[in-house]
Amino acid sequence: MHTRPLGPSGIEASVVAFGAWAIGGWRWGGTDEAQAIRAVHAGIDAGITLFDTAPVYGFGLSDSLLGQALAGKRDKIILATKCGLICDPTKGVKHFSTNALNFDDDGLIQVNRHSGGESIRREVEASLRRLKTDHLDLLQTHWQDTLTPFGETMQAMLDLKKEGKIRAIGVCNATSQQMAQYQAAGQLDSDQEKYSMLFRGIEKDQLPYCQNHSMAMLAYSPLAQGLLTGKLTTDRQFALGDLRR
């Protein structure tokens, strides 16, 4: 497995990453926990070192499954997670509402974008507990909170880095203008964006910015959520709650 530097962070990560959204079950029609753990182990055996999760993936389930699967293997992998999406309608700006894990439940959970300093710290502490680790290799803002000053968000992450709780700082789903505002307050190591043969919009904005600022570009959904694998047929039936349905 080839590796590449994670921007200027000094971290080397595999060019193929394990995206952990699906193992959380939410919006993927549920999950088989034993199979999810086997998939993580298979990824490690194949040479994958970069594992990327987020608190909103299964509302903590993805984190918890990774924590179980990585027991005794933590020193072999680069663990990336995210912050900035919280289940608190009183803070930040609304991002979406969902039926969460039980898709037959009529009660909606509202998820807001909020990247205030204290909120980020709470999210990180909760992620560390679920993942059963004492540090995160990469912390990324999941979606940008336009109500919180970018400098406040960056300072919170810099403080966590100084404390040894994170090693590198990144963003996801950010414009070049937003990245520039973050970088006015501190160093960004990476940006994660949707990128595949079918979705190439970042080639005009985010990708050139990252190249010009020596940042790593992490691509999510590079196989268009399975569409480009060649394994999906027109008669494929997806479970209730699966975003591909």
Feature annotation, model-predicted:
Residues 3, 144-245:
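Beta/alpha (TIM)-barrel catalytic core signal, keyed to glycine-rich beta->alpha loops juxtaposed to Asp/Glu
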Residues 102-115, 245:
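Short glycine/proline- and acidic residue-enriched helix-loop micro-motifs
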